[in-house]
Amino acid sequence: MQYLKPINVFSEIGRLKKVLLHRPGKELENLTPSIMKRLLFDDIPYLHVAIQEHDSFADTLRGNGVKVVYIEDLISETLSNDDSIKEQFISQFILEAGIRTENKTRALKDYFCNMSVNDMISNMIAGVTRDDLKNYKSDSLNSLVNSEYPLIIDPMPNILFTRDPFASIGHGVTINRMSTKTRHRETIFAEYIFKYHPIYKDNVPIWYNRDEDTTLEGGDELVLSRDVLAIGVSERTESESVEKVARKLFEQKISFNTILAFQIPQSRAYMHLDTVFTQIDHTTFTSFISDDMKFTIYALTYDVSSGSIKVKSEKAKLEDILGFYFGCKVNIIKCAGGDLIHGAREQWNDGANTLAISPGEVIVYSRNHMTNKLLEEFGIKVYQIPSSELSRGRGGPRCMSMPLIREDI
């Protein structure tokens, strides 16, 4: 089936037809113990095994009829046919990498311009070391003071999690303002893809942009149905951003009539809504709830006559709230069945971060064996992938993927 729109995502569970990934690369080998926390990693993955695990993920998707595209290929296609756009992109990337001195900027421009576009993108993601710019010399105070730091531009290891920099909603996208400085550059790629790529330019409405002054990340955005969108208010996404997206969607008269704002604790363990809540079938969800992880849910609707957004606090249980908006009884499968120890362990390793590839079929990390067994007992078809290295970045199958096209349900 051919889709008239390049973005078509009106659910979390419609059969996945096209998805965006990033295959791990040298950026993981430029992680060091001194910078990994700042770059949001809890440990240093072993690249060779991380690639094997990610290839298993991509092969599982392809084996189920999903077209896999890689972000580095999309941005390379965007820049390859217009030198002026490429030069603009390079300048913006260098500036947003925190480079301010004229000599260093010139050296980096020369470095990036003297390679193919594909290699340039790979090296931008990998980060630039002092050894990469062997001909660059500077006696500025800044360079001398920081001469022991091996990196001129930090690597971008979090681009592995393609879910976050932008999010597909309906026929459009939010291009997000990331919460942490280290992830800001990731959204430059989305900006250029949707502005200049021949498939996406002029064809994709933008519901939110990266120059907004409040943060929004894709792991907090879940398209529950054509009518209902869920957005987390979390460590990474601010409540003001939820209202901005809601107003844009309501005023553009997109199909969504309700935005459910899920407030969750501001915690590394629960950084996004999809670390504690995902949809896996028409009426079935995975979730993690504990003494320190509870949902507070607000419903945002639009009053057409006044042009105002109405906000109502939902007081019922999660399953009852969802049941009301879905118009039927729903099932909640808790991580490890709600076991205090195993539930917390498996949530930490993304047991609730499932990726639905069609209704009732999900990709999960094999390590979360208790949760996976429960899914199978509920009749869910479970595709398990290895994750000893991928999980070190605190993201699961949903985090590592951005659906571009899903079949309507």
UniProtKB/Swiss-Prot annotation:
EC annotation from Swiss-Prot or TrEMBL: 3.5.3.6
Q: Which GO terms describe its biological process?
A: arginine catabolic process to ornithine; arginine deiminase pathway
The UniProt keyword set, sorted, is: Arginine metabolism, Cytoplasm, Hydrolase
Please name the pathway: Amino-acid degradation; L-arginine degradation via ADI pathway; carbamoyl phosphate from L-arginine: step 1/2
**What protein does this entry describe?**
Arginine deiminase
Q: Name one GO cellular component term.
A: cytoplasm
Which chemical reaction does it catalyze?
L-arginine + H2O = L-citrulline + NH4(+)
